[in-house]
Amino acid sequence: MKETLIFDLSRKGRQGHRIASLDIEPQPAINLIPEKFLRTEPADLPEVPESEVVRHFIRLSNLNHHVDKDMYPLGSCTMKYNPKINDQTADIAGFTSIHPLQPAETAQGTLQLMYELGEMLREIAGMAAITLQPAAGAHGELTGILMIRKYHDSRASKRTKLLVVDSAHGTNPASAALVGYDILSVKSNAEGRTDIEDLKAKLDENVAALMLTNPNTIGLFEKDIKEIEQLVHDNGSLLYMDGANMNALMGITRPGDMGFDIVHYNLHKTFSAPHGGGGPGSGPVGVCDKLKPYLPVPVIEKHDDGNTSRYTLTTDRPLSIGRMMNFYGNFSVMVRAYTYIRMLGAEGIRRVSENAIINANYLLSKLIDRYDLPYPKPVMHEFCLSGDRQKKQHNVRTLDIAKRLLDLGFHAPTIYFPLIVSEALMIEPTETETRETLDRFAEAMLQIADETENSPETVQNAPQFTPVKRLDEAQASRKLNICCPGC
C-alpha cells in the first residue's frame, strides 16, 4: 500500500502534546526571540498527533531495504551485518559528550582510542604511518593523491599524469582529476587483470603514480602485483591501492608487503559501521615510510612517562599537506571500527576475509551455469556476472534482472559497473550471510533466469510488488523535484 506524505495526514488543530498549566505567567515565544530572527509568516508544518507520526515513519522504514532486514549484495560496497555492540560503544557518554576544541589533556581516552585504532589499521595493512582524518573513501583518495603531488613537488619533479587501471574503483579518476592530474587508463587483459604491456607503454617520466584496486572490482587478485610494483617504482612513480576491497585481504596478505606506497581503508565497509544514505564514513590513509612527512596534521603522538602514557596532537610537520577536515575525522565511525577489531582479534579478522571469499565462490558456483562469467574464476570476495546472454536471447537487460530482484525481497547488486563488463551484475555477499541466505538469493536469481526464458515480460515489467513501480530514473536525475506539495 502506498504511504501518504506526512502533510496529507495533517488536520488543523491536532497536536502531539499538551503541556500542563504552569504556576508562572507564560511568555509568548515571539517575546523571547529577537525580531530579526522571526518568520514573517507561519511555517507550513503538518499538524499530526505523536502516534501517527511514529506509525508513519515506522511504515516508511519497513519499505526500505537494509542489512538488518535481509541480504544486501551490493558489489564493491561490503554491506555486511554490523554488530550492535559497535553502536553501544559509540554511544558511551564519554565519547558522545566530548568537543573537538577541548584541551587534549581532557580527552586522553578519545586520543588513546584513535591512536590504538591507527596502530591496528597500520598493522593490518603493513604500512608505516596512518591518518584517520578523511571522512570517506573518496576523501581518502584525495588525501593520498595530495600527498603524491607534495612528494613529487618536494623533489622538484613536476609530474602531470596519473595512471588508473580500468578495473579500479570508480572514484579514482575523479579524485585524481581534482588534484589536477591528467588521467590515463591502463587496460585489463583477457584474464581481467592489469595488462602489463599496456602499463609499460604508458609509464614515462611524467607519471606520478598508478592507482589500482586489489582485489579489483571484478573480484580478481592482481597476481602480477610484484612485477607491477617493480615497474612503477623503477619509473620513480608511486603505487596507490584503493582499499575498497580490503575485506578479502585481512590477515591473509598486506598491501605494504606487496609494495604499495599508499592505501586507504573504508572503516564503514571493511570494519563494520552502518553506511549508505549519505554516511557517515571514514577513509583513513596508510603510507610507507618516505611519505610520513606529508601526512595531514594534526598527528596523534604517544608519549610514555614511566608507568603512564599521554597523547598529544602535533602540528609541527612542515611538509604536511595540511588539514583535510576542520577537526580529526568521523569519530563515531572510529569507535565502531575499534570495537569491531578488538572484538574479533587477529584470528577473527583473518576469518572474516576467509569467509567472505568462501561465500562469494559458493554463490558463484550456484549461478555460473545460468549467467555468463566474463573472466575466469576463482574469485576473491565478490564476482561480476554478465547479463549478455539474457539480453541477446530474450531482450532482458541487467536493469530488468535487478528490478525483478526487488520483487523477490532482495536488494539489487551493483549494475553496469565495472565498465569493462557488458551488462554487469557485481555481487558481494560478504562474510556475514549464512549458507541458507546465500541459497535463497541463488534461488531468486535462478527463478529470474527461468522467467527470462519462459516469460520475459515478467522480468521486463518488474518490479510489480514494491510500493512504487519502475521509475524513470533518467528523468528523475535530470528534473529533480524534492519539494512537497505546497512548498
Swiss-Prot record:
Per UniProt, subunit arrangement is:
The glycine cleavage system is composed of four proteins: P, T, L and H. In this organism, the P 'protein' is a heterodimer of two subunits.
User: Which family is this protein grouped under?
Assistant: Belongs to the GcvP family. C-terminal subunit subfamily.
- InterPro entries from the xrefs? Aminotrans_V_dom (IPR000192), GcvPB (IPR023012), GDC-P_C (IPR049316), GDC_P (IPR020581), PyrdxlP-dep_Trfase (IPR015424), PyrdxlP-dep_Trfase_major (IPR015421), PyrdxlP-dep_Trfase_small (IPR015422)
What's an example Gene Ontology biological process for this entry?
glycine decarboxylation via glycine cleavage system
Q: Identify the coding gene.
A: gcvPB
- MF terms in GO: glycine binding; glycine dehydrogenase (decarboxylating) activity; pyridoxal phosphate binding
Listed under catalytic activity are: N(6)-[(R)-lipoyl]-L-lysyl-[glycine-cleavage complex H protein] + glycine + H(+) = N(6)-[(R)-S(8)-aminomethyldihydrolipoyl]-L-lysyl-[glycine-cleavage complex H protein] + CO2
Q: Which UniProt keywords apply?
A: Oxidoreductase, Pyridoxal phosphate
Q: Does the keyword Oxidoreductase apply?
A: yes
Q: Which NCBIfam families does its entry note?
A: PRK04366.1
Name of protein: Probable glycine dehydrogenase (decarboxylating) subunit 2
User: Which CDD domains does the record cross-reference, listed alphabetically?
Assistant: GDC-P
Chain positions with N6-(pyridoxal phosphate)lysine modification: 269
> What general EC class does the enzyme of this chain belong to?
oxidoreductase
Q: What does the UniProt function comment say about this protein?
A: The glycine cleavage system catalyzes the degradation of glycine. The P protein binds the alpha-amino group of glycine through its pyridoxal phosphate cofactor; CO(2) is released and the remaining methylamine moiety is then transferred to the lipoamide cofactor of the H protein.
User: Which metal ions or organic cofactors does this protein require, according to UniProt?
Assistant: pyridoxal 5'-phosphate
Q: Is Membrane there in the keyword field?
A: no
GO (cellular component) term, any one: glycine cleavage complex
Q: Which HAMAP family match?
A: GcvPB
Might you give the EC number(s) for this enzyme? 1.4.4.2
